[in-house]
Amino acid sequence: MPRAERERQMMDAGVRVFGERGYRAASMDEIAELAGVSKPLVYLYLNSKEDLFTACIRREAAALIAAVRAGVRVDVPADRQLWDGLTAFFAHTAEHPDGWAVLHSQARSGGDPFVAEVVAMREEIVAFVTSLIAAAAREAHGDPELAEREVAGLAQALVGAAEALAGWANGDDSVSAREAAATMMNFAWAGLGNLMAGARWSVPDAS
């Protein structure tokens, strides 16, 4: 079997075990058995448990980002782009629950080196969402200009909400990717639409 195919099998097994048990509780013996190889071969190919976990994080992050980008068309309005991106995001996390568990929860509890990998992925997604919100502001009627700081904050809030919603949706088999995406659009875009049109919530006096 080619080395690349063997490594893919090992990483598939790693994602499943890490996703279910977490980094610290995961056993290289279990990963090797699930992959159908010897434990020494796992170490020969992927060096260490830490390196295997890092490789799993990077692979799953790249796959998620690729899925979201592939799902978005650039020739449609910004709200449709966001809808397409959210649908692709929730479809991917539903189809790869262990991969999402690795990215969203297990990597964050594994320590600084792993957290840094997830932060890099999240920053790329936030940058993508930031560009969509900025585009929506440019497309809007009235006074569409939003401060750069405000756009960045809105993107952070939207991504954080989508991450939380993915965890909820994956815990309920009755929730489809489209339903999760629609929930997110109703929560986020309805408010963003008003904001783009110049309707803002009035901050109360500090008294």
List each model region and its residues.
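Hydrophobic alpha-helical connector segments
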Residues: 55, 70-98, 148, 158, ...
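N-terminal intrinsically disordered/low-complexity leader segments
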Residues: 1-5, 137-146, 196-207
